[in-house]
Structure formats: C-alpha cells, structure tokens
C-alpha cells in the first residue's frame, strides 16, 4: 500500500475514532492533542489503526505517534 493510500485510511480512522468535526481538515501535521485527544482516546485510536491495518505497533513506535503523519510512518515501518 502506498503512502497516500495509508494516509487516506489513517485520516478515515482518526475521523471515526476521535469523532472529528466535519469542518476540520486533517493533514499529516495534525496533532492528536490539538483534536482534544487524551491518553484513552489515543489508546482507542491505536487499537483502531492496528485493527484496520492488521498489525501491532511496538512500544517504541507507540511513543512516537503524536500526529497523523507519525501514525502513517509507524504503519509504513510495521508493514
């Protein structure tokens, strides 16, 4: 799966999981904390991403996921 396809799926999962308002446009630079996500929300998001992409993030990758782009990079590295 190429970068743009992964990005599109990540944005979809983020929108669904964090219930992002329709008027908010997500980019690779969007930080989850700026969307009001707390640690529970991030855990829920990571679980949803792992399910969507059928993978498991290692602890090191989890510590680095703070933005949409970070999530895309972690998925690319895990595939």
PLM-predicted stretches and their roles:
Residues 39:
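Catalytic nucleophile serine of serine hydrolases
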Residues 1-23, 78:
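Thiotemplate assembly-line natural product biosynthesis machinery
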Residues 9, 45-48, 74:
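Generic alpha-helical secondary-structure signal
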Residues 31, 67-69:
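Short, structural beta-strand-to-alpha-helix junction motif
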Residues 17-34, 54-61:
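Phosphopantetheine carrier-protein modules
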Residues 43-64:
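Phosphopantetheinylated carrier protein domains
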